[in-house]
Amino acid sequence: MESQQLHQNPHCPHGSAYASVTSKEVPSNQDPLAVSASNLPEFDRDSTKVNSQEETTPGTSAVPENHHHVSPQPASVPPPQNGQYQQHGMMTPNKAMASNWAHYQQPSMMTCSHYQTSPAYYQPDPHYPLPQYIPPLSTSSPDPIDSQDQHSEVPQAKTKVRNNVLPPHPHTSEENFSTWVKFYIRFLKNSNLGDIIPNDQGEIKRQMTYEEHAYIYNTFQAFAPFHLLPTWVKQILEINYSDILTVLCKSVSKMQTNNQELKDWIALANLEYNGSTSADTFEITVSTIIQRLKENNINVSDRLACQLILKGLSGDFKYLRNQYRTKTNMKLSQLFAEIQLIYDENKIMNLNKPSQYKQHSEYKNVSRTSPNTTNTKVTTRNYHRTNSSKPRAAKAHNIATSSKFSRVNNDHINESTVSSQYLSDDNELSLRPATERI
């Protein structure tokens, strides 16, 4: 018969008992624990004082009979009640379904008291096997090769999430949420979840599944702490703590608004006007841009608007730059009024151009031909005569009268008649009388 001797291990923090078997025989009716404290070694006494709670060791019959030395077997010890993380108000590893989080302070153990206001998504029926994209997180970082083997055994949902996707950086400030959400949306797209994210028009290709909803909620919660979210995001999550899709929809809408703001600023900085379009159209275009920026809480002062408009003026409107260069109090309405005035003046001048061309055509040269000459002779006349000039017919009559009185005193000429008159040159007439002798 073999005997047992109980030794307390001073290095065990929870009083684990080890049973060792020796070859020395003891009477079978002796209780191995019925040993006085004086007979114990000194180090065993100290161990007995320190360890107030001891676990019962198995009886003599529980030790197998073996004449050889048996290796000590540690007894089961309950884990400590107070660990490193408190379990109240935290996600358990079985509830976390995130990707590659072990390197980001183990978000499965992060506090999320602001989000967990309802057990709708994280306390399912225990008989319902919740499929996961990846295995639950552990306290140690998994080996990359082992993690790939584990991923292959996990049942996949409708959309297969890509492994080894780089997570987004943690959200750090309320002002940078619009920038952070771009990285978060890119992270979801790289995880093959881009078809459940709303596009620029707010439309989605399909409805997300329960597992995808939980996956998006976990990732958003882990990397965007509640106290760092903007006010409008907090208002949405206070109504429905898991409505991350609405947050994404409004974020995309705000992105489009920001893009429109950028386009409006570019259009306002590149304004050009030379009078090719009406002044009213130009005023409406500029006013629409300024009003749209004002609706987005961006106020454009009159001075800034006038400076941008003056920079783009050209042609007849360019002189307004010098006029407004020394002005300190610029009014946008006054600038539009002066642009309208110059446009109207140019329009009136353009309407008068055809009548001026018609008056100028009256001064053009007019040709006239002589019918009685063999060779056509072209004469040039001006229709606008002076008051001192006389008609050509009156000149011819005066010349004929004077020649008649000169022939009366001539005795050799009995009768004379003018048979024909020819135009010899441009300024005077020549008479060729024909005389008949009896």
UniProtKB/Swiss-Prot annotation:
User: Which GO BP annotation is one of this protein's?
Assistant: viral translational frameshifting
In this chain, the site described as Cleavage is at: 397-398
Q: Where is the composition biased (Low complexity)?
A: 369-381
Which Pfam families does the record associate with it?
Answer: TYA
* One Gene Ontology MF term: RNA binding
**Which GO cellular component terms are attached?**
cytoplasm
Q: Does the keyword Ribonucleoprotein apply?
A: no
Report the domain of life of the source organism: Eukaryota
Q: Where is this region: RNA-binding?
A: 295-397
Q: Where is this region: Disordered?
A: 1-88, 365-397, 419-438
Any stretches that span the bilayer, and where are they? Answer: none
Keywords, sorted A to Z: Cytoplasm, RNA-binding, Transposable element
Q: In which compartments does the protein localize? A: Cytoplasm
Q: Which InterPro entries match?
A: TYA
- RNA-binding as UniProt keyword: yes
Skewed-composition ranges (Polar residues): 19-39, 49-60
Which proteins does it associate with, and in what oligomeric form?
A: Homotrimer.
Purpose: Capsid protein (CA) is the structural component of the virus-like particle (VLP), forming the shell that encapsulates the retrotransposons dimeric RNA genome. The particles are assembled from trimer-clustered units and there are holes in the capsid shells that allow for the diffusion of macromolecules. CA also has nucleocapsid-like chaperone activity, promoting primer tRNA(i)-Met annealing to the multipartite primer-binding site (PBS), dimerization of Ty2 RNA and initiation of reverse transcription.
Other facts: Retrotransposons are mobile genetic entities that are able to replicate via an RNA intermediate and a reverse transcription step. In contrast to retroviruses, retrotransposons are non-infectious, lack an envelope and remain intracellular. Ty2 retrotransposons belong to the copia elements (pseudoviridae).
This protein's domain notes: The C-terminal RNA-binding region of CA is sufficient for all its nucleocapsid-like chaperone activities.
Protein name (record): Transposon Ty2-OR2 Gag polyprotein
> Could you tell me which species this protein originates from?
Saccharomyces cerevisiae (strain ATCC 204508 / S288c) (Baker's yeast)
Q: What is the lineage of its organism?
A: Eukaryota, Fungi, Dikarya, Ascomycota, Saccharomycotina
